[in-house]
């Protein structure tokens, strides 16, 4: 990332959040790619832009981009990131207090990841749903969901996802 792009980020709660200028840069890059009909990794790029909007407090813009990403999944058949897109939708919905809809998206993400045998995506979605259930007081359900998924992994325990899963499971004990 160049110095100009780096300067438009700010650090917040362990995550980078793009300021307005950074969002504009991302939108410009996406528009340029679209203009030349470059669709390589289009859905994850839309997902990243949606996350940036969500972190900037622009949930509706994020949901619009995620809807566009899911339409691209259908149009192009680029399903590799489909489960993650549903998980991100769930996170955005949670940010605007739409827990029921978020749970549906997390469950859908888990089902898609399971069907694709995408264990990392399934772990992420299980973490998100387990957090929601924990926050709703459903400790047993959260643990029963997450523990077996976490148990599949035999390496990579220094990754953010596995660290998050371990910490969540310890909190559910």
Question: Where are the model-predicted features located?
Answer:
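Helix-coil-helix junctions within alpha-helical repeat/solenoid scaffolds
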Residues: 1-173
């Amino acid at each position: 990332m160049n110095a100009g792009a780096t300067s438009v980020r700010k650090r917040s709660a362990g995550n980078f959040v793009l300021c307005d200028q950074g969002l504009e840069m991302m939108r410009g890059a996406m528009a340029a790619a679209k203009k030349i009909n470059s669709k390589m990794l289009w859905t994850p790029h839309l997902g990243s832009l949606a996350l940036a909007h969500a972190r900037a407090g622009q949930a509706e813009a994020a949901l619009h981009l995620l809807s566009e990403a899911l339409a691209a999944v259908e149009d192009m058949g680029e399903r590799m990131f489909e489960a993650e897109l549903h998980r991100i939708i769930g996170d955005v919905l949670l940010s605007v207090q739409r827990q029921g809809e978020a749970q549906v998206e997390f469950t859908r993400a888990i089902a898609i990841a399971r069907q694709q045998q995408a264990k990392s995506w399934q772990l992420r979605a299980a973490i998100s749903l387990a957090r929601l259930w924990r926050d709703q007081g459903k400790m047993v359900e959260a643990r029963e969901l997450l523990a077996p998924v976490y148990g599949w992994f035999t390496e990579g325990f220094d990754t953010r996802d596995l660290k998050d899963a371990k910490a969540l499971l310890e909190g559910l004990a």
